[in-house]
Every structure is written in structure tokens, then in C-alpha cells.
From Swiss-Prot:
Signal peptide: none annotated. One of its GO terms (biological process) is cobalamin biosynthetic process. Belongs to the CobB/CobQ family. CobQ subfamily. It comes from the Bacteria. One of its GO terms (molecular function) is ABC-type vitamin B12 transporter activity. PANTHER family: COBYRIC ACID SYNTHASE, DETHIOBIOTIN SYNTHETASE. This is Cobyric acid synthase. The keyword ATP-binding does not apply. It comes from Clostridium botulinum (strain Kyoto / Type A2).
């Protein structure tokens, strides 16, 4: 089996998409390929067919490889709950909560497990494309590294180092990273990649030659800056502004925002523009307000209260349309109870009181794939998605459920999810990915179109668009990198 590891000079340099591109290229070339990231830190997660939790970046990479996402592609997922603490997910299930130092002391315990997963991949695939995290030059973490050079050494993988020229200082970041690696680590780096370049490559070439003279490693290509409709896991970045998009969707950007990839399908609609808001001054008059998921719902509810957005949301709810997803659904209720101190020691807190329901946080996390019917007079079509939450919500008298769940991890079930008020303009659900399918997205966006005097439109399947974008990404990267050299590095061709 062949393997290659993509590491970067920093977070957000484009490692994840380079891995996705290589997975699609190798697949196009007839090889069986699998992505692998030993440890990921992200609040964007996904539930596999067997009800296990993993990072969204490896989900996209799995699709690029033509595979169903599985937790062995991302055995360890860290989900920050505060600046100093995180929830540790191991093999798709909650391992526990820990401080940064506590997890640092735990890491070596997972080495054998990681090696076991990788050995299985060696048996099942022609090529494994690995991804590092952050930078390999975090010299204070070297002795317990299980995600960058430590992982590369564990499985004897060659490394390509990615630098982001769009941030500026790419030559210094590449040279500085190499300077801080030890001799054994330096030998693993077989090439560099300049990512997100804008302009004429000819102007860059003298710098590439000088860099090669300094670090004695060839540059394998310059990848142009490209806007693609593919999800970004590293942060809730501003969405691309569209020249003309009559439908304005505002999203509350809370401090602990999670699973904002739920919005990707919405931004695929040509006449929809999405913007984040962090203050009441930015609120304005959106056509739709989305309150997304949160890793700390109570803290984010307190944030809404403190910054004045609670007042703006309540005023908007009189005539505007609001959709809450997971944590965003919970804050719409009348009360949130936390008897086990899952998030805070407050015990309970009043919600926005826009939906007649209460949420109680339980000790066990719900992680499940679901299929649901939209409870609507016009359509009974299926919505697919997944749930990741600690809370159980109970309905009051003045409310209606939004969905009926009929399948949970492949088992037949029969229970309600979500809620909608009597007026029909405020609603919420626990289902992540609710907009990915056509049914719910088309219904909601067409309601907004009609309200603005626009014609209804048919929505396209998000996965079809994603496949086209992955092919486009692969084409760009294939023509930007020296693929013949990369095949030589991994011992293929």
C-alpha cells in the first residue's frame, strides 16, 4: 500500500481540500483510496451510518474517494467546549471531557489504536492520503505528537508541506517550519505546495527557486486561489458575497457555533445570500434568520442576552421567519435545564420563549442517523440527517411537531422531532443536514421567494453539486501539481 501525508505550516492553509483533491485524483486514476486524520479538532461533526461521530473534513474527503464515511478515517475528534476544555471523541463515541493538559498527557495512550486502524487501511486500500493538524513545528508538543510528524513516523509516511500564500509570508512560513523540524523529520518532507495563489505564477518562480536553495526541497506546484462550493471546517468564515441575491439569510454567529456546515446547501442556491451577524446593529431585515448549533448552548444563550441580540430576535419573530437547529432549536424554547451540570452549574435558564417547549440536558449524548417525514399538508417527502445533542426537549400545549422520525440508525421508530409555533414562522429541529436534501430546503426558500414576489424554483440535490465541485477541485489541483513526481514519491507508477 502507498501513503502520503499532507501537513501545513499552520491551520487553515488548505490541507483538508488538498487531501480531498488527491483522494479524487487517485480515484479517477483507478486506485482505491482512503483519507485518514488521526486527530481532528472541530465543532463540525457528522454521524456515520452506525451512529458514530467524526469530523466533517474527513466526510468530504471520503466522498472525494467514493467512500461512505467511517470513524476509522478520523479516530480521534476533539470538540472544544471552552478556551481550555474539550470533549474527546474516540472511535466515534464520547471518551470524556478534558483540559488541554489532561489530553496532552493522554495522547500516547492512543498510539496503538491509531496504528491498528492504519494497518487495516493498508490491507484494504491501494493508497491512503493522510492529513496533519495545524503545524508540525509545534516544538513544545513534539514528544507526544500523534497527528503530524509523530503519526508520519509511526507509519513511515512521506510528507508534503503546504503553505498559504494568500495570508502573506509563505516563504518564511515554509522555511521557518523546516528550520524547526529535527533531521529525521526534515528527511520525511519530499516537497512543498504553495496554496491559494492569485496572479501570474511567472512572478513567483524566482522566489520558488530561492526557497528550494534554502530548504533543499522541491516545490511540487502552485495551486491557484479558487472559490468552490465546498464546506470549510476550520471556522465560520464569511460567505462569498453574491452580485445579486434577493434572498437574504442571516445567521447568528455565536461564540460556540457548531455544525455551521448545515448552511452549505443553502448557499448553493443561486438567489440566496448568507451573512453572519454578531450584534444587533448587523441584524437589519433578513428574509430568514437561522440560529445554528452550539457546543455550549447555555453560554451562547447568555451571549445573545448580553449583546442585545435576544431583543432583536424577539422583535423579528413577530413577522420574520426563524429556524433553529439543535442548540439553536433549544434556545428558542421556554427553558433549558441542566441538572447534571453538563454545560454549566446554573441549573436552569430561561430560553427565548418563542417555542412552547423545554429542554433538559442528559448525561448521555444522542448520536444517530435519522430519516423523517415533514409534517406538512403539501408534502410528506423524506428528510435525511443526523442528530448530535445532549438535550431532550418536551412539548408544551401551544406547539406542533415539525417532523416525524421513522428510521433511526436503520431501525424502525416512530416519534416526533422539532417544533413549529401556531403562526408557522418560528420553528426548530435537532436534525443536522436538514437542508442537504431538496424537500425542506426547497419548501423554505420557495416560501421566502413567494413572500418577495419572486417565482418558485426547483432546488438541486446538494450531493450532485458537491460531486461536480470535487471534480472541479481535482482538475485544478491535478493541473497545478507535479502528479508524476507525487506518484514517484509514493512508489506508484
Amino acid at each position: 500500500m502507498a501513503k502520503i501525508m499532507i501537513q501545513g505550516t499552520a491551520s487553515s492553509v488548505g490541507k483538508s481540500l488538498i487531501v480531498a483533491a488527491l483522494c479524487r485524483i487517485f480515484k479517477q486514476d483507478g486506485y482505491s483510496v482512503c483519507p485518514f486524520k488521526s486527530q481532528n479538532m472541530s465543532l463540525n461533526s457528522y454521524i456515520t451510518l452506525d451512529g458514530k461521530e467524526m469530523g466533517r473534513a474527513q466526510v468530504l474527503q471520503a466522498y472525494a474517494a467514493g467512500l461512505e464515511p467511517e470513524v476509522y478515517m478520523n479516530p480521534i475528534l476533539l470538540k472544544p467546549t471552552s478556551d481550555k476544555k474539550c470533549q474527546i471523541i474516540v472511535n466515534g463515541k464520547v471518551y470524556g471531557n478534558s483540559t488541554a493538559m489532561g489530553y496532552h498527557n493522554l495522547k500516547l495512550k492512543f498510539k496503538n489504536m491509531l496504528k491498528g486502524h492504519f494497518n487495516k487501511l493498508e490491507e484494504d486500500f491501494d493508497i491512503v492520503v493522510m492529513e496533519g493538524a495545524g503545524s508540525p513545528a509545534e516544538i513544545n508538543l513534539r514528544d507526544r505528537d500523534i497527528v503530524n510528524m509523530g503519526m508520519a513516523e509511526l507509519v513511515d509516511a512521506p510528507v508534503l508541506l503546504v503553505g498559504d500564500i494568500d495570508k502573506g509570508g509563505v516563504f518564511a512560513s515554509l522555511a521557518g517550519t523546516m528550520l524547526l523540524l529535527n533531521e529525521g523529520e526534515k528527511k520525511r518532507v519530499k516537497g512543498t505546495i504553495i496554496n491559494k495563489f492569485r496572479g501570474d505564477v511567472e512572478i513567483l518562480k524566482p522566489g520558488l527557486d530561492m526557497l528550494e536553495d534554502i530548504i533543499h526541497i522541491p516545490c511540487l506546484g502552485v495551486v491557484p486561489y479558487t472559490r468552490l462550493q465546498l464546506e470549510d471546517e476550520d471556522g465560520a468564515v464569511e460567505f462569498n458575497k453574491k452580485a445579486y441575491a434577493p434572498i437574504d439569510i442571516a445567521v447568528i454567529k455565536m461564540p460556540h457555533i457548531s455544525n455551521f456546515t448545515d448552511l452549505d446547501a443553502l448557499k448553493s442556491e443561486e438567489d440566496v445570500s448568507i451573512r453572519f451577524i454578531t450584534s444587533k446593529e448587523e441584524f437589519k431585515e433578513p428574509d430568514l434568520l437561522v440560529i445554528p448549533g452550539s457546543k455550549n448552548t447555555i453560554e451562547d444563550l447568555l451571549y445573545l442576552r448580553k449583546c442585545g441580540l435576544e431583543e432583536s430576535i424577539k422583535e423579528y419573530s413577530k413577522d420574520g421567519k426563524i429556524i433553529g437547529i439543535c442548540g439553536g432549536y433549544q434556545v428558542l424554547g421556554s427553558k433549558i435545564k441542566d441538572p447534571h451540570n453538563v454545560e454549566t452549574d446554573l441549573g436552569e435558564i430561561d430560553g427565548l420563549n418563542l417555542l412552547d417547549m423545554e429542554t433538559t440536558f442528559e448525561k448521555e449524548k444522542v448520536t444517530t442517523r435519522v430519516s423523517a417525514k415533514l409534517l406538512n399538508e403539501e408534502t410528506k417527502n423524506t428528510v435525511y440527517g443526523y442528530e448530535i445533542h445532549m438535550g431532550i426537549s418536551k412539548y408544551g400545549e401551544n406547539i406542533k411537531p415539525l417532523f416525524k422520525i421513522y428510521d433511526k440508525n436503520g431501525e424502525k421508530v416512530d416519534y416526533f422531532d422539532g417544533a413549529i409555533n401556531e403562526k408557522g414562522n418560528v420553528m426548530g429541529t435537532y436534525i443536522h443536514g436538514v437542508f442537504d436534501g431538496v424537500v425542506f430546503r426547497e419548501k423554505i426558500i420557495n416560501e421566502l421567494r413567494v413572500k418577495k414576489g419572486l417565482k418558485k424554483k426547483k432546488s438541486q440535490m446538494y450531493e450532485h453539486m458537491r460531486e461536480k465541485e470535487l471534480d472541479k477541485l481535482a482538475d485544478i489541483v491535478r493541473h497545478s501539481l507535479d502528479m508524476e513526481k507525487i506518484y514517484s514519491i509514493i512508489g506508484m507508477k
